[in-house]
């Protein structure tokens, strides 16, 4: 019954494989076999059910003092639930407090297969279990994990309607918490085994979970950690109290706990509704709107959990136990930031009719058909970012949390793809997304790996939004995880534990071109700003048997552009051009295809074993399909982290190896192919190294060869069918120094000149709106042209930012200059026009050319009358008469309006009120404008006067003297006022006459000018002095 070997069968959920044989009565993967089978001890079955269940449970945590354990070993009444206190924070760190990657398992049939973590220190804890004497008693004890919700073998507290594989989640804290059940009501009257095994130093705490009946199996339950109980518990009344200074609950006795949870099991789904996750009544749209929720996690300063979330009972035995619990909890607060990174998210729904192949999932992953998200945990800031993964059943994305990732063997995928579950579990895995459209095609070997090597994990470390194939490996579990089918929904996993050995940043095997006809109907794998950071931890490449090539091949024919426009969602998030910096994570292979038209006979294959590469993503403007890979890993390496390869090679070694391989690379200029020779001959079939994807009028993609401006690099390729546009580059762009930037500036200048020369021929191919240019991402050139690639990239980015009002990037700089000059000239014209209006309230040109006859006639008549008056009378008399005339008019009009208003009894107000309200004040600005204009003329006049009178030029001074002598004769004949009258007549008559008879006047003026010139020459010829000067 209680066999010592059976005690070690489940000694550690992470260091053993739980090899409970299906033939063993209590070793089945279903905990339902535990209460039904009384001939066999239930310890192993309880442990198996604890890790192989598949539904989320309410969590309860038992915590008592260490004294209770010793009293339990010494024949204390079995009604007490004895659990161990927590170790100190230093001891827990020594035992490797982690959120175990290994705590995930798959059930094949009814046999749970659990991969072990490979921790040696856990074995030490397991060896301590064998030291205790093992006797038979009436208490049920699990040697490694306590049975969830007080479940014991003899009197089942789990309803009979439970699914075959209920889920339990056990978080190893380096301690074993033992729940000792008081009474065992086995139908056969047989007591269970190992009642007091490993109670002294083997301390653990267990997150116990409730279960769901099959009728509620499709519903999404709340997933809780740290004894987050349902908000309401039906059945018997439950007294809920917070244990002092403790986020965990203390339950007094098992009977009340069993009775309490028996009813809570039945209503766990309904009770979780308010603050957990969605129910099955919610639609996919509702789920998708709320799929970015993260449940609030308690930290050190956040206070207590809600009352409804804790099934807390006051421990009533001793005050010492409470003090012990409080002390232990205070110790636990030292590392709660890492523990609380356990996230609570829903999981993909399982088909209930395939219970024999039911997949075991941990509590953090609920089985829902709706979308879920991957929170990638930033261990430094304890922030959670969620990543929706494309659902296999073709409905909505799947999400999985960071804490414990269950590898879901999705049976729906097999049903859709029509492929049977293969027997070889470590064979090639594929991530084939089947859409809801009828034109979806089947994809084979999207991610091909050699047999025996589990699929590699795919992280998308992006500040933008990436659509990538995400494949999760279980390499750090010593490659012992068996996968159930070849169509696994495997997702990114991030270890949030404190152990540096478990902190992994895996390779990026991003395949954005995998079967776009499947991506289009699916919500693509959207990973917004998922950055995995590990504070002060080493980053290790987890071994994967053999470091083989990640091949992206067998791309089938893509669907039409219209279907892509209809189905592909906008996941770009308006990421700017060339935002993706190069990541330093090894084996970063992205094969990008144009999503519009790709020849199915020519798949793009990107293979790069054991070589770090940098990814420059293409943004497909048409479908807003982008892959942004940031430099998180590179920045971590700059901060002193150590990125380790399989053979523990440093990043420098990897770069050196890649450099050697790059030096061996052969650039075939005719075919523009880049061949990298490495351990496996890897062929990079690329297009001309610098290419830009543009969106043409037909909705497809058009490759416009910007690189053709560099004639030594590439050839012009126009059309709608792109070649492979993804070369690899060994060194990141961040390493370019100032000299390269100077070369970039030089190249930009040369390119600008060439663009002006080729503007006429290139404009036809370069028609692209500025918004589209801003959205496009340019590919890097191969290894042999890293600087030129960076130059072109920067040039394109600058062109995109400089577009502004121009839609032709070829002539953008010239257009900008023209616009600037034109705008400047317009501004000057406006200023001149303003000055002219300030100097003269009307245009003199319009006046003298009689553009407005009324205005010109009024001005001409008034000035002529005034001049005639001055000719007949003195100036004083003229001015006085003019003022009297004006006043007589205004006063008469004012009296007239007043009389009219009095007769008509109207109150129109002052007749000149509109003119009185006009602001005629001269501002300082206007005065300065007047003065500036006047000073120009005044200074010119002063300079001319000084020049003439001081005889700077004798000839000019003589000319002035002759002119003044002639004016004496004019003054003797004409008065000054007469001259002014004549001048006014000429000003208002000559321009209009000249404009009307310009041709004739110019002819006669030319004749007169020629005659005058001939006469002057004759006179100068007779003067000897002037003739000699001209001869010299």
UniProtKB/Swiss-Prot annotation:
Where is the region Disordered? 1-61, 545-617, 696-726
Protein name, as recorded: Reticulon-3
GO CC entries: endoplasmic reticulum; endoplasmic reticulum membrane; extracellular space; Golgi apparatus; Golgi membrane; neuron projection; plasma membrane; postsynaptic density
Tissue distribution: Isoform 3 is widely expressed, with highest levels in brain, where it is enriched in neuronal cell bodies from gray matter (at protein level). Three times more abundant in macula than in peripheral retina. Isoform 1 is expressed at high levels in brain and at low levels in skeletal muscle. Isoform 2 is only found in melanoma.
The taxonomic lineage of its organism, from the top, reads: Eukaryota, Metazoa, Chordata, Craniata, Vertebrata
The record's subunit annotation is: Homodimer. Interacts with ATL1. Interacts with RTN4. Isoform 3 interacts with BACE1, BACE2, BCL2 and FADD. Interacts with ATL2. Interacts with TMEM33. Interacts with ZFYVE27 and with KIF5A in a ZFYVE27-dependent manner. Interacts with RIGI. Interacts with TRIM25. (Microbial infection) Interacts with Coxsackievirus A16, enterovirus 71 and poliovirus P2C proteins.
GO terms in the biological process aspect are:
apoptotic process; brain development; endoplasmic reticulum tubular network formation; endoplasmic reticulum tubular network organization; negative regulation of amyloid-beta formation; neuron differentiation; vesicle-mediated transport
Mark out the compositionally biased spans (Basic and acidic residues).
545-568, 696-715
Query: How is this protein situated with respect to the membrane?
Result: Multi-pass membrane protein
**Reticulon domain residues:** 844-1032
* Cellular compartment(s): Endoplasmic reticulum membrane; Golgi apparatus membrane
**Where do transmembrane segments lie in this chain?**
none
Tell me the superkingdom of the source: Eukaryota
- The region called Interaction with FADD is annotated at 987-1032
Predominant location category:
endoplasmic reticulum
In the UniProt record, does the keyword Manganese occur?
Answer: no
Induction context = By endoplasmic reticulum stress (at protein level). Up-regulated and self-aggregates upon RNA viral infection.
Residues with N-acetylalanine modification: 2
**Cross-referenced InterPro entries:** Reticulon (IPR003388), RTN1-4 (IPR046964)
